[in-house]
From Swiss-Prot:
Transferase is among the record's keywords: no
Chief location bin: nucleus
Residues bearing PTM Phosphoserine: 65, 401, 406, 849, 883, 891, 951
Family matches, as Pfam families: AAA, AAA_lid_3, Bromodomain
Name of protein: ATPase family AAA domain-containing protein 2
Species the sequence originates in: Mus musculus
CDD domains xref list: Bromo_AAA, RecA-like_Yta7-like
Compartment list: Nucleus
Xref: SMART domains: AAA, BROMO
Cellular component aspect of the GO annotation: nucleoplasm
Entry coiled-coil feature ranges: 619-643, 735-761
Modified residues (Phosphothreonine): 801, 825, 972
């Protein structure tokens, strides 16, 4: 930060006799300098400044990255153990990056090169960037560091022609120089979109440059390129081949085991930790939630717990003291979080998979299990998709494949181990029955009557159980809702993607309506594409129908046959399932007493004390030393600036009369009028003694010079008027110079340093020159009789010595607290001492005093305040001190009182008023004031109580006192309920709903629930039981 606003002029010189060779050299140096400046911006994110040696230290001076650091800043706390449910992806990344560094001998033995490129694709929030950050941190440990470069797709784009390609070349060049290195392109679809004739030529050139850099004639060496996108179809196909992006990793939505691992990661630092059973149940309800959604659920649950325990913090802006141990996260906090957080997968397109709700789970859970058993016979891959296999464990992902990691011995493929047998088969590609499940065109049709829930409950529950598989929905809204593509094109694209991502599921809900609505072209396209799927490809066709199998069209019947168990008929719930369905509602929820709010009200009324401001972290000795050095550098600039201003004022002939202090021998009455003498030489001395920490302190002394001159020199003769004009000019000149040349930020910095030193208790004169403190001891004898005044910090009144020039800074720091009565006290003592010593000099030098006193600058910046506006206590203290002195020096004090008539009258008037008040309080008036004292004391106590309760009233705005008292005063009556009547109602409901379908049962459940809700606050449940009986009796299933 520069102190003065000075202009810097650059001098350019050129030699006209320079040869062409020198010009070429200058051009080459300029070109090299520009290239280095551009390379300086391409530096890895995971290297700190102190870790880069040599030339890289200079490169860090410009910037660490071209990318925006805010959204892409590297979080060093993210490791591979912070990523859950992606063990296979992490293992593949270790093979690409970590293992070639740790085990180079393996790759050297077989002369192989590990994969140098991979592509992450999948929905948003599934952990693509998180895995990249974890990889960067894992590569930043150990001796062999890996430089990690992170770029977003649009970072390399520029409006200048050829600049984007140049930035890419510089990026790869920098990564090659710092190899091994990783380049991560986030949202690469914005950098390398599909090239076409309709596209802009600039994008095509960028894509061509990126293709050549990744796998061109020049080998890129130990540079791993990782791309991430959620739009795989938007990337140029040339990037998706071996040599560029060798591997493609699908980041799908996490399954149940992966969600549980993610929950464990986000709750592992909680105290106490959630139990494993709760996390498993929570993971089961988080269907369709990505990793970012699960993290948001944990954060929202913590906020719900805080909101429930301390609602007071939402009604005040001050920080309150909280008991963190009383904030506990319960299951209902997670329930509230699940209701608030909507999964990312359901914001754009609703996922077809959905678990059975807690209400219908007792009714349909057995049916779902029977469907899964029937599906396992048709589609054996169900076992892989539903079992809790070991591949979810990060420590053993190799157990996933039985074929690759079996203990079976195979024939040797080397020349030294080959036997002499002929016609030996090495590869057994057709022997897969022992290692993986196999099925022939797996298909399943769930049929039933309308209202059996096959499309609304059963099929989504089955898809939810098979959540490891990718699901492609071919319903009517999907086919006809996309305006840019035809239904035939959308159908063919989905089935092709299903074949590519096998094992997968093609889901066709309401196939009876689907087949009636679509045209013959779409029917032919659908059947043809199904036939093109390989016979043993694990692509399941799942469909639902609300018509019997015999009522379906012949083409649909040909797709599903009875002989292979591809038809599942949904049956009505039996008696046991209906009993479980209504049992919890009728027997438990109906008998639940009203919710008590007394605990919540007490928590809302709890008064929380205001938390003290957080104390700053204590600095170490080294940090304190470094901080003091920086502060002293700033104050050194301040002193240089103030000396410059003072010097400019002193050399001005107009202000020569203010450069030296007044001689007391020539002007004896000066110290009796002016309480704080000040001049420019004293200002210089204070600068040398480090008394000025801000420019405001300096300007106070300039104002002091001006006010002293105006006070001592009355506006009577021309000489005094000239001095008064010059004093005002001195003040205006000083202010103008500082206003013009001082930086406002620098003044603010000085004030912050001054405040920081006060808090730390650091002395402002610690670095002051030591010889200044020796001089006053040699000049102290002339003022030896004023030693008591020095004990009271009144060293100010010796104007001819350096002490008088340096001590005002000590007085200025205490000016607002003590200077008033100290100066008032010293007026009398000064008058006494100087009356004895200078009585004759005052008469002899009266003619010279009018001219010589004008050379002084007379202080007391707030002089009238010390006499007219002093407080009662200050005047009383001053009166006592003056009365003691007057007893000893009656004659001399009377002479001095005549010199200061007006200030004395004012002071005495204040003292007399004080004396009158004190006397009346000590006399008979005390009886008159006794009665009001009691009432006033009560009012004061009430006022204190009101002020103390101010924060409480503000906190209690959350709930009114009347409402709180009404809730707390309510008695808790006993619950009146006949359980036998509830049991009879349950039997009646189960018997009456014998032939009800799923929708009718849900309707009856809603009717009973409404009755319970209406009487939820009643302790007498007799009316509830009667209303439930009436509702069950009057229920008509025809409207369902």
């Amino acid at each position: 930060m520069s102190l003065l606003k000075m202009r810097r002029h650059a001098i350019h010189s050129s030699d006209s006799t320079s040869s062409s060779s020198s010009e070429d050299d200058c051009f080459e140096r300029r070109t090299k300098r520009n290239r280095n400046r551009a390379i300086n911006r391409c530096l890895p994110l995971n290297f700190r400044k102190d870790e880069i040696r040599g030339i890289y230290k200079d490169r860090m001076k410009i910037g660490a990255s071209l990318a925006d650091v805010d959204p892409m800043q590297l979080d060093t706390s993210v490791r591979f153990d912070s990523v859950g449910g992606l063990s296979s992806h992490i293992a593949a990344l270790k093979e690409m990056v970590v293992f070639p560094l740790l085990y180079p001998e393996v790759f050297e033995k077989f002369k192989i090169q590990p994969p140098r490129g991979c592509l992450f694709y999948g929905p948003p929030g599934t952990g693509k960037t998180l895995v990249a950050r974890a990889l960067a941190n894992e590569c930043s440990r150990g001796d062999k560091r890996v430089a990690f470069f992170m770029r977003k797709g649009a970072d390399c784009l520029s409006k200048w022609v050829g600049e984007s390609e140049r930035q890419l070349r510089l990026l790869f060049d920098q990564a090659y120089q710092m190899r091994p290195a990783i380049i991560f392109f986030d949202e690469i679809d914005g950098l390398a979109p599909v090239r076409s004739s309709r596209q802009d030529q600039i994008h095509s050139s960028i894509v061509s440059t990126l293709l050549a850099l990744m796998d061109g004639l020049d080998s890129r060496g130990e540079i791993v390129v990782i791309g991430a996108t959620n739009r795989l179809d938007s990337i140029d196909p040339a990037l998706r081949r071996p040599g560029r992006f060798d591997r493609e990793f699908l980041f799908s939505l996490p399954d149940k085991n992966a969600r549980k691992e993610i929950l464990k990661i986000h709750t592992r630092d909680w105290n106490p930790k959630p139990v494993d059973m709760f996390l498993e149940e929570l993971a089961e309800h988080c269907v369709g939630y990505c990793g970012a959604d699960i993290k948001s659920i944990c954060a929202e649950a913590a906020l719900c717990a805080l909101r429930r325990r301390y609602p007071q913090i939402y009604t005040t802006s001050e920080k309150l003291q909280l008991d963190l141990s009383s904030i506990t996260i319960s299951a209902k906090d997670f329930e509230a979080a699940l209701q608030k957080i909507r999964p990312a997968s359901q914001r754009a397109v609703t996922s077809p998979g959905q678990a059975l709700s807690a209400i219908v789970k007792p009714l349909l859970q057995n049916t779902v299990h029977r469907i899964l058993d029937a599906l396992q016979k048709v589609f054996p891959h169900v076992e892989v998709g539903t079992n809790k296999s070991l591949n979810s464990d990060v420590s053993c992902p190799f157990l996933e494949s039985d074929l690759a990691y079996s203990d079976d011995d195979t024939p040797s493929v080397y020349e030294n181990g080959l036997s002499q047998k002929e016609n030996l088969n090495f590869l057994h590609l057709n022997r897969n029955a022992c290692y993986q499940p196999m099925s022939f065109r797996p298909r399943l049709l769930i049929v039933g009557e309308p209202g059996f829930g096959q499309s609304s409950h059963l099929a989504p529950a089955v898809i939810h159980a098979l959540e490891k598989f990718t699901v492609y929905t071919l319903d009517i809204p999907v086919l006809f809702g996309i305006s840019t593509t035809s239904p035939e094109e959308a159908c063919s694209q989905m089935i092709r993607e299903a074949k590519r991502t096998a094992p997968s599921i093609v889901y066709v809900p309401h196939i009876h309506l689907w087949w009636e609505i679509v045209g013959p072209t779409l029917k032919a396209t659908f059947t043809t594409l199904l036939q093109t799927i390989p016979s043993f490809a694990p692509v399941l066709l799942l469909a639902t129908s609300e018509k019997p199998y015999s009522a379906l069209p012949e083409e649909v019947q040909e797709l599903f046959t009875h002989d292979y168990g591809e038809i599942f008929n949904v049956q009505l719930p039996d008696k046991e399932e209906r009993t479980k369905f209504f049992e919890d509602l009728i027997l438990k929820q109906a008998s639940k007493p009203p919710v008590s709010q007394k605990k919540a009200v007490l928590q809302a009324l709890e008064v929380l004390p205001v938390a003290p401001p957080p104390e700053p972290r204590p600095l170490t000795a080294e940090e304190v030393k470094r901080l003091e050095e920086q502060e002293e550098d700033t104050f050194r600039e301040l002193r240089i600036f103030l000396r410059n201003v003072t010097h400019r004022l002193a050399i001005d002939k107009r202000f020569r009369v203010f450069t030296k202090p007044v001689d007391p021998d020539e002007v004896p009455d000066y110290v009796t009028v002016i309480k704080q003498p000040m001049d420019l030489s004293s200002v210089i001395s204070k600068i040398d003694l480090h008394k000025y920490l801000t420019v405001k302190d300096y300007l106070k002394d300039i104002d002091l010079i001006c006010s002293n001159a105006l006070e001592y020199n009355p506006d009577r003769d021309p000489g005094d008027r000239l001095i008064r004009h010059r004093a005002c000019a001195l003040r205006d000149t000083a202010y103008a110079i500082i206003k013009e040349e001082l930086d406002e930020d620098f003044e603010q910095l000085c004030e912050e340093i001054q405040e920081s030193r006060k808090k730390r208790g650091c002395s402002s004169s610690k670095y002051a020159p030591s010889y200044y403190h020796v001089m006053p001891k040699q000049n102290s004898p002339p003022v030896g009789d004023k030693k008591p005044d020095q004990e009271q910090n009144e060293k100010l009144k010796v104007p001819c010595t350096p002490v008088a020039c340096s001590t005002p800074a000590q007085l200025k720091r205490k000016f607002h607290k003590k200077s008033k009565w100290h100066v008032g006290t010293k007026i009398k003592r000064r008058k006494i001492s100087q009356a004895k010593d200078n009585s004759l000099n005052a008469m002899n030098s009266s003619s010279r005093s009018d001219t010589e006193d004008s050379q002084h600058t007379h202080a007391e910046h707030t002089e009238p305040g010390n006499t007219d506006e002093s407080s009662v206590e200050e005047s009383d203290k001053q009166n006592r001190l003056e009365s003691n002195i007057d007893l000893k020096n009656n004659s001399s004090s009377s002479n001095i009182e005549n010199e200061l008539e007006e200030p004395k009258e004012t002071t005495e008037g204040t003292e007399l008023r004080k004396d009158r008040i004190v006397c009346r309080g000590d006399a008979s008036a005390s009886q008159v004031t006794d009665i009001p004292e009691d009432s006033e004391s009560k009012e004061m106590d009430f006022l204190r109580m009101t002020l103390a309760r101010g924060s409480q009233v503000e906190q209690q705005e959350l709930i009114s006192m009347e409402q709180a008292l009404a809730i707390l005063s309510q008695p808790t009556p006993s619950l009146v309920l006949d359980h036998k009547q509830l049991t009879n109602i349950l039997k009646t409901v189960v018997k009456k709903s014998q032939k009800y379908n799923i929708f009718q049962l849900e309707n009856l459940y809603a009717v009973i629930s409404q009755c319970i809700y209406e009487h939820r606050r009643d302790y007498d449940k007799t009316a509830l039981v009667q209303k439930m009986e009436q509702a069950v009796e009057n229920f008509n299933c025809s409207r369902s």
